Amino acid sequence: MKKVKSLKGKTVAIVGMGKSWFDYNLAKSHGVHFDEVWAINAVADVIYHDRVFMMDPPSRFLDTDDAGGQTDSMIKVLKEHKGPIYTCELDDRCPGLVEFPIKEVVSDTNCFYLNNTVAYAVAFAYWNDVAVINLFGVDFSYKGNLHFAEAGRACVE
């Protein structure tokens, strides 16, 4: 995959499902401009966006209920979205999937700490020379077991 030249020097909002995603909505309602908005997973079913990052295999949503509450939203996104939806593997049932350019990103940027979807989106922005990255909703906390997955952080240290 080649770099997306139109991203160079741009301002991007990356929006995940954590509590601070409401701050994205507040920013937009107060006139804050982003050249592009990138949705993480099921946020793609809720807000306007230009790109989706979903580093789970599509089969996780299409063939299982492993994603819990995200399952129905992601099935809709995967079957209807024209893309790009950057992911780890392609699936013929999903028209908008684009395989994430992992080799190019790692080789060109020396970014190796890619352990969740937000980190992949940030690395993609870095690889494409995005000037400003605004993170919303990447503060992951879960009811019951407050920080069981990402330890409450976006893993983009």
Residue locations for each model-derived region?
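Metal-ion/cofactor- or nucleotide/acyl-coenzyme-handling active-site neighborhoods
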Residues: M1-E157
